[in-house]
Each structure stands twice: as structure tokens, then as C-alpha cells.
């Protein structure tokens, strides 16, 4: 009796998938209004995670730690002690600037 042993092998190599190729979208954090810049009430001064820069005079802090201006004025970044910074907004006479 004739016994045939037929074995089929793969004609293409098995290919694994790569674990690369994805990244999270950037969050666009950082300083949005620079020192000495005129801002309107509600303008964002700094977008941040945590309180890297603390709110100073006339500056509010949002629930995501974003600092924003409470009044129209000029932004000033100041040091508090040795290792802390704060952002403040000081009112400015708009008529004096226009002249």
C-alpha cells in the first residue's frame, strides 16, 4: 500500500505587529501672556499643570490651574521667596498710554 505524507508549509513569514506609532496630543501648556504685556479681563496668562506659577494680585486660578486676568492691566511676573513665582496684573491708565 502506498502512503503519502503531505505536509503544507507557510509560504509567507509570519509578521508581528509593532508596538510603536501612537502618541498623545500635545496639551499646549505654557505662558500665554508675557511680562509687561497688556491683557484684558479674562485673558489667559499661563496654562499649567499644578501651581508652577502662583496667582498674585488681580489674577484668578481655574480648576485646571490656569491663571487668568481678573482686570484689564499689565502682566508682571514676580518672585516670592527663593523658589516660588507669582503672576500679577496691575491696572494701567489707558488714556496715558494713548497720548
Curated annotation (Swiss-Prot):
Question: GO annotations under biological process?
Answer: translation
Q: Which GO terms describe its molecular function?
A: structural constituent of ribosome
Q: Which residues form the propeptide?
A: 1-9
Which Cys-Cys disulphide bridges does the record give? none
- Pfam families per the UniProt record, alphabetical: Ribosomal_L27 (PF01016)
* GO CC, any one term: cytosolic large ribosomal subunit
Keyword set for this entry? Ribonucleoprotein, Ribosomal protein
Provide the record's note on post-translational modification.
The N-terminus is cleaved by ribosomal processing cysteine protease Prp.
PANTHER family in the cross-refs: LARGE RIBOSOMAL SUBUNIT PROTEIN BL27M, RIBOSOMAL PROTEIN L27
Family in the record? Belongs to the bacterial ribosomal protein bL27 family.
Name of the protein in question:
Large ribosomal subunit protein bL27
Q: Write down the species.
A: Clostridium botulinum (strain Eklund 17B / Type B)
Give the organism's phylogenetic lineage. Answer: Bacteria, Bacillati, Bacillota, Clostridia, Eubacteriales
The UniProt gene name for this protein comes to rpmA
Amino acid at each position: 500500500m502506498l502512503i503519502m505524507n503531505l505536509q503544507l508549509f507557510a509560504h509567507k513569514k509570519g509578521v508581528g505587529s509593532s508596538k510603536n506609532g501612537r502618541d498623545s496630543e500635545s496639551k499646549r501648556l505654557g505662558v500665554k501672556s508675557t511680562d509687561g504685556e497688556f491683557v484684558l479681563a479674562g485673558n489667559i496668562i499661563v496654562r499649567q499643570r499644578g501651581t508652577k506659577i502662583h496667582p498674585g494680585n488681580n489674577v484668578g486660578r481655574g480648576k485646571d490651574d490656569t491663571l487668568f486676568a481678573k482686570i484689564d492691566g499689565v502682566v508682571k511676573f514676580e518672585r516670592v521667596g527663593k523658589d516660588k513665582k507669582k503672576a500679577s496684573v496691575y491696572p494701567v491708565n489707558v488714556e496715558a498710554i494713548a497720548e
